[in-house]
Design a protein with these regions (language model features):
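Active-site-lining helix/loop region of Rossmann-like oxidoreductase modules
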Residues: 1-115
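C-terminal active-site/capping subdomain that shapes the small-molecule cofactor and substrate pocket
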Residues: 80-188
Length: 188
């Protein structure tokens, strides 16, 4: 494994009840043509995406992004692994959605990767003609759903995945990334 890139779209419930109430309140205010006063997120979250989910350091990285990099390196026992992580605040109540790109040192086999993930406990791969969603599939489930497993357009060593989970039932974004551990160790 040479590189991991993760873009995680986090729901407002990642901020607890306050986040859920904030999205509901902002949505009602906007739909009733009332002025909006952001409280929890510092900006409008209703019908909007925010480019960060928490405070950023001097280099512009959020705490959650740095934690994901550190924990994934430790989990994989690859302390020098190049990892890029971006966390986005999405205007959804529940369910995490991740775009994950993995680059290995040799050509990837998307079908073998898909089969390996599908065999992993707590992971369900949705066939290539469909894809899972956080609301339609993952909500209320303890399963991590993986879809759109495919090799990169320009680089046959690259594999791209779409991963969704119920953040309340299954845990944080790191748990979704951990589901790819078998794939990384066995096939990249």
């Amino acid at each position: 494994l040479r590189r991991v890139t993760v873009t995680a779209c986090l729901p407002v419930s990642s901020r607890g009840k306050a986040g859920v109430k904030e999205l509901a309140r902002q949505t009602a205010e906007l739909l009733n043509a009332r002025p909006l006063e952001p409280r929890v997120f510092g900006r409008q979250i209703a019908f909007n995406m925010l480019a960060q989910t928490d405070n950023v350091d001097a280099q512009g990285h959020g705490e959650q992004e740095r934690r994901l990099v550190e924990e994934l390196r430790q989990l994989l026992d690859l302390p020098e692994l190049t990892i890029s992580a971006t966390f986005i605040q999405a205007p959804t109540f529940f369910g995490e959605s991740l775009v994950v790109s993995l680059e290995g040192s040799c050509e990837a086999d998307a079908q073998a990767l898909s089969s390996a993930l599908d065999a992993a406990p707590g992971v369900e791969v949705v066939e290539s003609d469909d894809y899972p969603t956080a609301v339609g599939d993952a909500a209320g489930q303890d399963v991590i759903y993986v879809g759109r497993v495919r090799c990169g357009i320009c680089d046959p060593r690259e594999v791209n995945l779409w991963i969704v989970s119920d953040n309340v039932r299954k845990g944080a974004a790191l748990n979704a990334v951990r589901s790819g551990e078998l794939l990384i160790k066995e096939y990249l």
